[in-house]
């Protein structure tokens, strides 16, 4: 997926979950930018961190910029747009290029089942698969961890997937998408959200398909790369 032209900035501070103050490196001007990722991001959003941003499409928006990438001190890139994960998976499903779901046809995105909405509904030889996608940005070395903040909604969805998987008409899966260029494995971060980690383990034990995929990330492009191990 091609990224728009990005402007180099430096992180100043974070007034709230969805807004960051940045300093342009070309004009030294301080600007406000929308932050698409509401996670804690404590390891990334440190004073002086390099942020790559794009101008807002809507000239009337309160924040004139959107934060797209963060560059770590080691030179790794991390996507700050959680929506990229679903966009990449949708493209890969449509083109049959996602190894873990080979042969499955994309039927619907944001499918409602009961009182909940799930990311994707897939079909294969009369079978139906419900798929949830999770974006992973927290990394320590080459290990990715999820979540980086408590996600009650995420745990609820995983338990609903587990219940669906026990029904004869459904199969279910969770796909963790690394949005950090250096991640080669994914683990559950139980010290941040023990309930989500418990829900994933229960899901895995009851047959929910748990998988993860890495990404190739640059300031020009982002694309899914290889299937990587998940530790549950």
From Swiss-Prot:
One Pfam entry for this protein is: SfsA_N
Q: Cite the InterPro entries for this sequence.
A: SfsA, SfsA_C, SfsA_N
Q: Which domain of life is it from?
A: Bacteria
Q: Which GO terms describe its molecular function?
A: DNA binding
Q: Which Gene3D superfamilies match?
A: 2.40.50.580, 3.40.1350.60
Q: Which family does it belong to?
A: Belongs to the SfsA family.
What NCBIfam families does the record point to? Answer: sfsA (TIGR00230)
Q: Which HAMAP family match?
A: SfsA
Name of the protein: Sugar fermentation stimulation protein homolog
Q: Which organism is it from?
A: Shouchella clausii (strain KSM-K16)
């Amino acid at each position: 997926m091609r990224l728009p032209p990005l402007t180099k900035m430096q992180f100043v501070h974070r007034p709230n979950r969805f807004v960051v103050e940045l300093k342009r490196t070309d004009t030294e001007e301080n600007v406000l930018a929308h932050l698409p990722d509401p996670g804690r991001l404590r390891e990334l959003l440190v004073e002086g961190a390099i942020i790559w941003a794009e101008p807002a499409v809507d000239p009337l928006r309160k924040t004139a910029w959107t934060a797209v990438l963060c560059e770590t001190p080691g030179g790794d890139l991390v996507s700050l747009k959680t929506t990229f994960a679903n966009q990449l998976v949708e493209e890969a499903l449509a083109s049959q290029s996602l190894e873990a779901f080979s042969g499955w046809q994309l039927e619907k995105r944001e499918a409602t089942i009961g009182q909940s909405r799930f990311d994707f509904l897939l079909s294969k030889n009369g079978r139906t698969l419900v798929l949830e996608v999770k974006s992973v940005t927290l990394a320590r070395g080459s290990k990715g961890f999820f979540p980086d903040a408590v996600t009650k909604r995420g745990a609820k969805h995983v338990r609903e997937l587990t219940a669906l998987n026990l029904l004869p008409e459904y199969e279910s899966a969770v796909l963790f998408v690394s949005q950090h260029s250096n991640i080669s494995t994914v683990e559950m971060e139980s010290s941040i959200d023990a309930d989500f980690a418990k829900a994933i383990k229960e899901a895995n034990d009851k047959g929910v398909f748990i998988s993860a995929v890495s990404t190739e990330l640059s300031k020009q492009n982002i694309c899914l790369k290889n299937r990587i191990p998940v530790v549950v």
